Amino acid sequence: MKFVLLFGVFLVTLFSYSSAEMLDDFDQADEDELLSLIEKEEARAKECTPRFYDCSHDRHSCCRSELFKDVCTCFYPEGGDNEVCTCQQPKHLKYMEKAADKAKKFGGKIKKWFG
């Protein structure tokens, strides 16, 4: 009985050691893969298109404002046949940013009064 118990403990120890080595190998492979993905992402990053500039070349390249990303909006000017695309901020997001800015200022005043 003691022999079976010792043999079982030996097998459990051996199994845990081998699985720990396998996990270390997997973790190292994941870290290497993650680093290569980060390097590719940095290489892919480019300049954003400012507000009211042409974004027809890349409609997802508009810059971020304080809280929200601008949207590439396309339209046909009066009397024109070609489409014009510019980065713009939708009105509802503009109003939300103004409200957030006023709330920040009001919060600062309250903090100054009571803080």
Curated annotation (Swiss-Prot):
Leader sequence segment: 1-20
Keyword hit for Secreted: yes
Principal location: secreted
Keyword Signal: yes
Protein keywords: Disulfide bond, Knottin, Secreted, Signal, Toxin
GO MF terms, alphabetically ordered: toxin activity
Disulphide connectivity of cysteines: C48-C63, C55-C72, C62-C87, C74-C85
Tissues where the protein occurs: Expressed by the venom gland.
GO CC annotation: extracellular region
Pfam families tied to this protein: Toxin_35
Localization (cell): Secreted
Prosequence residues removed at maturation: 21-44
Domain observations: The presence of a 'disulfide through disulfide knot' structurally defines this protein as a knottin.
Family statement drawn from the similarity comment of this UniProt entry: Belongs to the neurotoxin 19 (CSTX) family. 01 subfamily.
Protein's recorded name: U3-lycotoxin-Ls1a
Source organism of this protein record: Lycosa singoriensis (Wolf spider)
High-level lineage: Eukaryota, Metazoa, Ecdysozoa, Arthropoda, Chelicerata
